[in-house]
Amino acid sequence: MTKWIISSFSFLIFAVVLFINLQNNSEINDEFNTNLANVTNEEMESVIDQNPDIHPMRMALANRYFDDLDYSQALPHYMYIAENSADNELKSFALAQIGWMVYESNNLDVATTYLNESLRINSESLVAKSYLGIIYIQDPTKQNEGLEILNSVIQSNKLSKEDRNFIVEILENYEK
């Protein structure tokens, strides 16, 4: 009987210690979670200059430039990630972003090369598929392929509501 009491008591203590440890680890993770919202582009550039292989920060900075349509600042960061990152998801995303920037500069063939390489690395990349679908849907010779790609993209449960609505709007304009 005492074995069972000791065993039960030991298990209870173990569960309490485990719970406390998990709580402490969660608090520590929250403490060290990096929030870049209050970090300036200049500060990020400085950190990246000193630590060129800090790919997540480099990607965050490139995305800021991309969102501001400052492609000349975004491109070197995406290129660095595409050439140096071992993370296929980051590499694929960087290539897709490069592909879109190249498309925006009216170089369709090079743009589709980057997007196809992005998809070769990560065949599930919604960004690369979306960009390729948008490019193809505007080309009368590839419009059906573009429609097919975009229709497959909107089926994904990983797509944000805003992105889904944007793609649905494009499809509605071209399916008329």
Where are these regions (language model features)?
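Canonical tetratricopeptide repeat
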Residues: 60, 94-97, 131, 166-170
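Long, contiguous interaction/recruitment modules in multidomain scaffold/adaptor proteins
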Residues: 1-50
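Canonical positions in the second alpha-helix
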Residues: 46-47, 81, 117-118, 152-153
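Alpha-helical adaptor scaffolds
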Residues: 63-121, 134, 138
